[in-house]
Amino acid sequence: MSITKDQIIEGVAALSVMEIVELIAAMEEKFGVSAAAVAAGPAAAAEAVEEKTEFDVVLKGIGANKVAVIKAVRGATGLGLKEAKDLVESAPAALKEGISKDDAEALKKALEEAGAEVEVK
């Protein structure tokens, strides 16, 4: 006569916590497995992306119209002429960090209209 699943469940339910721990250890040894929890992979990464509220705007390249890009950078960052020029010439460089998505998209649009290559991270 074979044991049914229901009988196994009833038998485990009747065990004490220490007996269950010993049973798990014996099963791990018998079947060569571990009862450790499996880490969540892609689902956890997807949740992290959804929760992102701060973005960085990175100047990747200046394009053909360097003067217009410098003006756009000055207007967006409040830097002086020399600082804005140095920042533009050091591309790729972070222009603003930790800003909202709307602000990041507006800044990206303004810089792209000036001829710059921009990335929002």
From Swiss-Prot:
Keyword Glycoprotein: no
Pfam families cross-referenced by the UniProt entry: Ribosomal_L12, Ribosomal_L12_N
SUPFAM superfamilies per UniProt: ClpS-like, Ribosomal protein L7/12, oligomerisation (N-terminal) domain
UniProt entry keywords in alphabetical sequence: Ribonucleoprotein, Ribosomal protein
Annotated GO biological process: translation
Membrane spanning stretches: none
Domain of life of the native organism: Bacteria
This protein's name: Large ribosomal subunit protein bL12
UniProt source species: Serratia proteamaculans (strain 568)
